[in-house]
UniProtKB/Swiss-Prot annotation:
It is found in: Cytoplasm; Nucleus. A motif (TEK-box 2) lies at residues 91-93. A motif (SH3-binding) lies at residues 179-192. It comes from Rattus norvegicus (Rat). The lineage of its organism: Eukaryota, Metazoa, Chordata, Craniata, Vertebrata. Transmembrane segments: none annotated. One of its GO terms (biological process) is smoothened signaling pathway. The N-terminal destruction box (D-box) acts as a recognition signal for degradation via the ubiquitin-proteasome pathway. The TEK-boxes are required for 'Lys-11'-linked ubiquitination and facilitate the transfer of the first ubiquitin and ubiquitin chain nucleation. TEK-boxes may direct a catalytically competent orientation of the UBE2C/UBCH10-ubiquitin thioester with the acceptor lysine residue. The gene is Pttg1. This is Securin.
Amino acid sequence: MATLIFVDKDNEEPGSRLASKDGLKLGSGVKALDGKLQVSTPRVGKVFGAPGLPKASRKALGTVNRVTEKPVKSSKPLQSKQPTLSVKKITEKSTKTQGSAPAPDDAYPEIEKFFPFDPLDFESFDLPEEHQISLLPLNGVPLMILNEERGLEKLLHLDPPSPLQKPFLPWESDPLPSPPSALSALDVELPPVCYDADI
């Protein structure tokens, strides 16, 4: 089989590509490309780094640095290129378009049944004007509704907060629950311990 021998590019001199004797004997197999000899032999399988025929480079952006001609503006007014239609044809077309398009009221009847949804409506609470919320210490208070009027009146008549006296608010839980009550809630019967080695 004919093999090609190539000289390293650093040491390459013009015309230094060599081919085997079998390749040189085949007259049809030798082609002159750009002043260099190259043997075209059939290759089987993948060939890595083997030189092929020179390919034209692909232009990704088309022609670069090409001067394009600017369209010449004419001083004539633009004319429509539509052919002139008779009055009869125009009236026929207008009646067809009017009959095919539905009336704007009939187009979307479900829009009239649409109710706009505002999520803030569910988070706003209306209070009577006589209650002043600005006097309440509401920092860190969760959003909740109090059903008891006594608790609401108690909240509305609070004095400004003081570091010595902290009012008990109904939504707060006891910060230090009694240990026996907490432990009694944790008493749960567990299944018996199984020491079998089979499991």
